[in-house]
Amino acid sequence: MPTVEYLNYEVVDDNGWDMYDDDVFGEASDMDLDDEDYGSLEVNEGEYILEAAEAQGYDWPFSCRAGACANCAAIVLEGDIDMDMQQILSDEEVEDKNVRLTCIGSPDADEVKIVYNAKHLDYLQNRVI
């Protein structure tokens, strides 16, 4: 069963961290963060990451649940996420910036690391509902 280690973008931003720093997850693990802000999820085969987070009782951001907005956007830092058809992200955002939508995304590796709540990034702001 794939495991997704996650970190809330708001925590990264509030602490002035660089989410692309190799040790950003180490820094998060050294803090006393709520489970919703940092931790790991096991995601069942065919389950979307957002669904797995909700099954744990987490209130991660979303709106459309159909890949038509950027509310549930996450940045993949390790591993990969396979998305169903999405209509909102550019090829550059998917291929170069590693943006994925957790509402239609499932892990495509045994271990994945993401920064969720990435809707706050400047280049995604105009697609948040």
From Swiss-Prot:
Keyword Cell cycle assigned: no
Keywords: 2Fe-2S, Electron transport, Iron, Iron-sulfur, Metal-binding, Transport
Entry keyword Transport: yes
Binding-site positions, [2Fe-2S] cluster: 64, 69, 72, 103
Gene3D superfamilies per record: 3.10.20.30
Pfam families on file: Fer2
UniProt-listed CDD domains: fer2
Domain named 2Fe-2S ferredoxin-type: residues: 29-120
Entry cofactors: [2Fe-2S] cluster
InterPro entries: 2Fe-2S_ferredoxin-like_sf, 2Fe-2S_ferredoxin-type, 2Fe2S_fd_BS, 2Fe2S_Ferredoxin, Beta-grasp_dom_sf
Binding note for cofactor: Binds 1 [2Fe-2S] cluster.
Entry's Gene Ontology molecular function annotations: 2 iron, 2 sulfur cluster binding; metal ion binding
Sequence similarity: Belongs to the 2Fe2S plant-type ferredoxin family.
Its job: Ferredoxins are iron-sulfur proteins that transfer electrons in a wide variety of metabolic reactions.
Protein name: Ferredoxin-1
Source species of the chain: Haloarcula marismortui (strain ATCC 43049 / DSM 3752 / JCM 8966 / VKM B-1809) (Halobacterium marismortui)
